[in-house]
Amino acid sequence: MLSNPSQVVLRNIELFESKNVLLINHECDLLATALLEDAAKVTTLALDFNHFQRIKSHENARLQCHFGHQLPSTQTFDAVVLFYPKSKSLAPYLLNLAGRHLIPGGELVIVGEKKGGIRSITKQLPDYFDGGIKLDNARHCMLYSSSLLSEAPEIKLSDWVKDYVLSTPQGELTICNLVGVFSEKRLDEGTELLLEHLPTLKGRVLDFGCGAGVITAALLKANPDLELECVDINAMALASCELTLAANGMQAKVYASDGLTQTQGMFDAIISNPPFHDGLDSTTEIATRFVQESEAQLKSGGIFQIVANRHLPYSDTIAKFFKTVNVAAENNKYKIYANRKA
């Protein structure tokens, strides 16, 4: 099943006849394989690891799939399809990236949901693209086209990052935020409560859903000898976490993982401010899987400590897999769940 934006792209498949096409920030579907009916070759760059996993197994001589914030080569394409990001601040970066990978005069096709920022895309196009035209309007989405007029500037991550000093219970930290990565530029209430009640940790520790690396850096500030691993599904978050580590002179293993699937071995502790906040059934299912996988990959006596919104049903899930529920701290918004594996 194709997402609405992907369906609109497929409605206009004639744009890609016999062309070498790049998809940037694509959806969690198989649009790339469908485009091969007309396109000569398709390359995909997913910024979401789950979206990459969805298409990766379909790779062949005409389909190349990548995950990350940039392609591993300077290859150029006849056409680039850019899926407008949910975070509007990420759009200028992706437009720059698209420009770097287009041949002179190459076509940029931009698709997005109307409720996003796609309506004003012609005002957002940098001057190395022409003004852009609307090609389609369907499935609650809009599709625009623009041509590359001149060479797009080289991408340097340092141009797309904002750093700031954050005061935490463990001390001051420098946090690096790339565009598109959530930041309040202060310690959010949930993370603050978690850091205020961190246990003494040692050994191999996992920071699940690391984001820009706030918890990561705080853990290493408290104990630089931790064997710390940091996972997320967002390419910009992972790159931000690496920049945060470098800015604080710290080291950890940072990589993409769907839940805990890509992690290996057992951990002495799993610490997290899990990115599941809306309480929807689908989100609750993911959260349940996270608790189950965490219990399975903790050593005996290992620590599982997370912060969560009070209204989320973590208690029953934790009781199911850890046999007991321990709330180490709470306020009117959040709870700290702290359990040890039997």
Curated annotation (Swiss-Prot):
The entry's keywords:
Cytoplasm, Methyltransferase, rRNA processing, S-adenosyl-L-methionine, Transferase
Record-linked CDD domains? AdoMet_MTases
Record carries keyword Disulfide bond: no
Which InterPro entries does the UniProt entry name for this protein?
DNA_methylase_N6_adenine_CS (IPR002052), Mtase_sm_N (IPR013675), rRNA_ssu_MeTfrase_C (IPR023543), RsmC/RlmG (IPR046977), SAM-dependent_MTases_sf (IPR029063), Small_mtfrase_dom (IPR007848)
Report the function annotation for this chain.
Specifically methylates the guanine in position 1207 of 16S rRNA in the 30S particle.
Q: What does the similarity note say?
A: Belongs to the methyltransferase superfamily. RsmC family.
Q: What is this protein called?
A: Ribosomal RNA small subunit methyltransferase C
**Organism name:** Shewanella loihica (strain ATCC BAA-1088 / PV-4)
Q: Source taxonomy lineage?
A: Bacteria, Pseudomonadati, Pseudomonadota, Gammaproteobacteria, Alteromonadales
Q: Which gene encodes it?
A: rsmC
